[in-house]
């Protein structure tokens, strides 16, 4: 850790003094052959593989400077496919050197280098993304997921068409290498990265089939891939049109992102980032002035542009050509869905999002008369996908296919308080997350399933009946928590089903809502 701290301090010092030393050309290769970096990487690999950890005192017996240089030279000179075949053959062999078994073969070195590459990328990218983090801190950004809906209600309701676009993830490995060559210009490091990305072809695919050992690298490459896409897109807009950013980049779930970028602590399971980027600006091509609104959530983004449907179709072809030219990959047209805001609905962050007309009556008082008129405006309509929620509860073994509650047999080994807290936590998070929906009363069907599933789980554990469980626990099953009292204090005179609640302290997605995406 001393080496990492020294390198980061040195890089910051060079940036402050504005010297002519290109730090990305000097430090990346040096980090690959640092003993402390190797010790951290080997300890990570040993923790995952169940092997014994390596101390710094015993490090020279395992990894010498000459061995590292020789291995990196072999990677640079040989074909990576031949190297991978050799590592597979060497994995099954054991060499003996005296009385000690020589178990750390090429495969062991390869996995260690993979961990080292992840560490180096975290160090280098953390320094490069510090200006971006400072920009987020200067902006009036919100950490809440629900802050996106007031923004969409203010701006998207005036747009006739929306483009719902899914970002392609099947990128050629050499495209990823080209991205990093722009930032890290030393030759040995991209060769080491090339060896890894060629072994795992779909390394940035958004799928749970990715091995757990490369999830951290997959997350890092995905975030950098999205960063390159958005920075290229915005810079192109600024060069082509007079693009002036009005409200730039509201970053949600900022705490988790900073922990991931600055490498504050090691996370055992890293999931895909749930950043939501909001970008709006004015575009002035020739003499016609219009506005563009861009919202990205996970692997999807929505573009709203004023004008006719013909204009949004031109933007569709623009994104197809943009992806082919800058990323050298075929952007399949079915990934772009053109939706009318007044008719079509789209899935969005576990909700069903749409717009509906709303009639507002206005009274205008004249001198001796009272005129009553009305006008129609669009209103954001957020609906809970109840049927999808029931399907997910069925998948999680809370109910059967017909929606009847069943016992959660996997939780019967827990304590009674733990079972009650688990069910109460699920219901509390669902209530918070869907508090701004119009059909919030449909959540009582979900509450019914969870309530009886909790009772049946306790009855199955104690080998009794539900009647005995009701009599024993009573109101402890789903007690009236503080989030009920909060609504009663604010809406004491108004029925809370008629008002939408957006909780601006909700900074992470619940796992069921994440599955609905």
UniProtKB/Swiss-Prot annotation:
Keywords: Chloroplast, mRNA processing, Plastid, RNA-binding, tRNA processing
Coiled coil: none
Pfam families membership: Intron_maturas2, MatK_N
GO molecular function: RNA binding
GO cellular component entries: chloroplast
Compartments, record wording: Plastid, Chloroplast
GO BP term (any one): RNA splicing
Protein family according to the UniProt entry: Belongs to the intron maturase 2 family. MatK subfamily.
Name of the protein: Maturase K
Gene: matK
